[in-house]
Amino acid sequence: GYVTSEDLPILYTLEGHGEKEMDSTIKEDIEKANMDIQSLNLLTEGSVPDDADCLFIDSPSTDISEDEKTAIIDYLENGGKAMIFSDYTTEDLPNFDAVLENYGVQREAGIVFEGDNQHYAMQMPYYLVPTINSTDASSETVSGGYYVLVPYAQGIKKMDDVRDTVTINSILTTSDQAYSKTDLNSDTLEKEDGDEAGPFDLGVSITETLDDDKETQIVYYSTSNLMESQVNQMVSGGNEKLIIESLKWMTDTEDSATVSIPSKSLSVSYLTLTDYDAAFWKICTIGLIPGFFLVVGVAVWMKRRKA
């Protein structure tokens, strides 16, 4: 449930470009965290509404128009906030990419694979378990000891030539053994010539300090699969925790002193095992533990024989 003292912060979700529909569980969790979700068609509206507390862009599968790009950048350059997700696509998205590049980040070509088995799960090197860095948008997730699971992500590249008023912080980072596979029709999952070497950011927070005490804030994650409820359950709610914390960092306005009462989730929590952990427990269950009982059994038998 939730308690409010003022109007709720409004989260406008961009529509009209084949965006993913928000997972119903995460939508419910955002509403429980005291945010009002409205849809936004920039083609008809022309600009981001004045009452927007945050713009939510969920992985457009076709590009935004030149006018929409201008409207989004205008909103952000006036101290706007945005949470942005993208997914790997063979489509060119020059206007969408221009919004990201205006704030110093680019999408790497390909999908990130992890070479370190402590950083991927379920024997799938593209189900990434990145390091969560402590930032204003992620510190509670870190201190709570959560993991996040990030499937099919692209690398995020920080550009060298960005305004000095822009600060980019890494939220999610792969190991330095990660690589980005550009040829997804390849016969191998191993690193090949032409694959970009890591480490890579998979999530960043971006701030830009403006003249009139305003601050632009953006959180960008390079896969919308972060929001899938099945993926979230595998890490006992870690993904949801991070997304909600990122949104709260941006929408924490002084004039909406809201109190959220987290509801207990009845969904199943899975044991989060990286591939390294899984291999260790496999050795224990197949070898060490049965071996221990065998030794004990032999000792008992020897004792009885002597008796």
Please give the residue ranges for each predicted region.
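Short, surface-exposed patches at the edges or C-terminal ends of soluble domains, predominantly
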Residues: G1-A307
